[in-house]
């Protein structure tokens, strides 16, 4: 049975479409045609498992949230367009609903080689994008599964990295799903070195970089999903911006 997630607005049919993310078909009732274009690589005709309806009230709320976030980060508040904010509302709705379907939204750059995905994560400005480009330029056969916000699908004992339309400023990404072979926490350093770390050592970063539900009732589900990342090999990489950094992380994860 479909479950609707909707506010109180009525929408025109021309802005209705379906997308498939992490194997889940979703019906979207959008306000702007640009949102369908934003999701163009994920469109589907499959019957949806749930629906999302976006309203101006939700867009206004997320605008205020974005302003607060900018101010807290010491940045001048940006004049975000309603079209852009609608994509964030959609992401928030989907990420919350996905928790009950064993899918977690994660902030990081997922690169792929040899049909396996490796997820790099770090605080903003540390160099996820730079390190991703080093892999593209140095590791043969590498491509980017998602450059900013992949979904992580938990299925039985396995974890899969899944593409999404939210691919970051560079637009790196593909609509595919691959086994997640490692999560790597990036730190700046003068030399390049990588080490395996425990789930407890990685926990503070995993908490910070994963999507937390807006509803308290879903927090237990979120924490249970997060704990399942303990089954994924975890690493800490100290790196600079030289080509060697890509080889150190590749050999430290893919060749183990």
Predicted regions and their residues:
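Conserved lysine of the Walker
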Residues: 128
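Hydrophobic positions on the alpha1 helix immediately C-terminal to the Walker A/P-loop
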Residues: 131
């Amino acid at each position: 049975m479909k479950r609707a997630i909707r506010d109180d607005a009525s929408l025109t049919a021309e802005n209705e479409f379906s997308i498939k993310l992490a194997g889940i078909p979703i019906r979207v009732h959008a306000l702007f045609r640009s949102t369908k274009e934003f999701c163009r690589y994920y469109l589907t005709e499959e019957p949806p498992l749930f629906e999302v309806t976006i309203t101006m009230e939700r867009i206004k709320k997320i605008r205020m949230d974005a302003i607060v976030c900018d101010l807290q980060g010491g940045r001048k508040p940006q004049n975000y367009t309603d079209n852009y904010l609608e994509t964030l509302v959609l992401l928030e709705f989907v990420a919350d609903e996905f928790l009950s379907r064993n899918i977690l939204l994660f902030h990081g750059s997922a690169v792929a080689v040899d049909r396996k995905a490796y997820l790099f994560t770090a605080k903003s400005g540390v160099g996820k994008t730079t390190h991703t480009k080093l892999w593209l330029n140095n590791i043969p056969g590498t491509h980017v599964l998602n450059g900013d916000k992949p979904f992580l699908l938990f299925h039985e004992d396995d974890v899969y990295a899944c593409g999404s339309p939210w691919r970051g400023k560079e637009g790196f990404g593909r609509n595919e799903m691959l086994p997640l072979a490692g999560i790597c926490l990036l730190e700046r350093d003068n030399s390049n070195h990588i080490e395996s770390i425990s789930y407890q050592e990685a926990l503070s970063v995993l908490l910070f970089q994963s999507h937390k539900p807006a509803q308290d009732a879903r927090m237990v589900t979120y924490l249970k999903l997060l704990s399942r990342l303990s089954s994924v090999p975890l690493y800490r990489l100290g790196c600079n911006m030289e080509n060697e950094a890509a080889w150190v992380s590749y050999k430290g994860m893919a060749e183990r």
